[in-house]
């Protein structure tokens, strides 16, 4: 039986960003240095495939520090943690490694700098997301006000409209964030803006790659976890760009094939915590059902790398 023709357009860049790659290496190197088990507070990155692989290697994932014994090392996830977490680890004399993405740490430092200068912070982010919790937890309670939508801006009650600054979660929709920033600047003209955009390069690049696909495709598949903020934003970007079908799938087994009937051009993107092996799995699934042509649509090359913490570098360099 002849397979129907279909073109897969692969978004590039896609998949692992430098912060995710660094965080995964930290867990792997910690296991090599200290042996299993190594405890990780929260999923190191939001991807089940990655977490399951590290669990098989000996990582134990917990949600709170008190679930980890004091005699084993603990790693903080790439999303960042409130200041109270490392303080508690030190109080308990625990060995810990902070895998917070350096670009998230930059936002933390930015918030602290503004706080020291007497400014009240407004954070654009998603309530309950670990990154938002970690960033807001850098300052005393009440010093950071959270907004999620343009509508939230109207309801803000600030101490002094002349003494404000805003920061953002690094994995937001660029377009949605721009609208919220515009609302903030309209209501609070004196608000201090970041020296550099807080939304990270990888989020920006992956959303740009999806937009570049949009005029060629009828459907979009985003490979990523449902709790991955940046992956969910890619689905939203695809829908906003006019994709009739935009699915978020963790594995090829989750693809809704019925929704792809009659489709001849599909875009494939991957969130910043999705490994390339899952992209290969999706391509293989399409080749089983379609006469598949694969085309790469590359918008930018990424060359960003982040070093792992010194405690692990020294272990790796020791002969």
UniProtKB/Swiss-Prot annotation:
GO terms for molecular function: 4 iron, 4 sulfur cluster binding; 4-hydroxy-3-methylbut-2-enyl diphosphate reductase activity; metal ion binding. GO terms for biological process: dimethylallyl diphosphate biosynthetic process; isopentenyl diphosphate biosynthetic process, methylerythritol 4-phosphate pathway; terpenoid biosynthetic process. Dimethylallyl diphosphate binds at residues 46, 79, 129, 228-230, 273. Keywords: 4Fe-4S, Iron, Iron-sulfur, Isoprene biosynthesis, Metal-binding, Oxidoreductase. The active site is at residue 131. It is an enzyme of class 1 (oxidoreductase). It catalyses: isopentenyl diphosphate + 2 oxidized [2Fe-2S]-[ferredoxin] + H2O = (2E)-4-hydroxy-3-methylbut-2-enyl diphosphate + 2 reduced [2Fe-2S]-[ferredoxin] + 2 H(+); dimethylallyl diphosphate + 2 oxidized [2Fe-2S]-[ferredoxin] + H2O = (2E)-4-hydroxy-3-methylbut-2-enyl diphosphate + 2 reduced [2Fe-2S]-[ferredoxin] + 2 H(+). Isopentenyl diphosphate binds at residues 46, 79, 129, 228-230, 273. Pathway: Isoprenoid biosynthesis; dimethylallyl diphosphate biosynthesis; dimethylallyl diphosphate from (2E)-4-hydroxy-3-methylbutenyl diphosphate: step 1/1; Isoprenoid biosynthesis; isopentenyl diphosphate biosynthesis via DXP pathway; isopentenyl diphosphate from 1-deoxy-D-xylulose 5-phosphate: step 6/6. Its cofactor is [4Fe-4S] cluster. The keyword Metal-binding applies. Binds 1 [4Fe-4S] cluster per subunit. Its EC number is 1.17.7.4. It comes from the Bacteria. InterPro entries: LytB/IspH. [4Fe-4S] cluster binds at residues 17, 101, 200. (2E)-4-hydroxy-3-methylbut-2-enyl diphosphate binds at residues 46, 79, 129, 170, 228-230, 273. Catalyzes the conversion of 1-hydroxy-2-methyl-2-(E)-butenyl 4-diphosphate (HMBPP) into a mixture of isopentenyl diphosphate (IPP) and dimethylallyl diphosphate (DMAPP). Acts in the terminal step of the DOXP/MEP pathway for isoprenoid precursor biosynthesis. NCBIfam families: ispH_lytB (TIGR00216), PRK01045.1-2 (NF002188), PRK01045.1-4 (NF002190). Belongs to the IspH family. This is 4-hydroxy-3-methylbut-2-enyl diphosphate reductase. It comes from Cereibacter sphaeroides (strain ATCC 17025 / ATH 2.4.3).
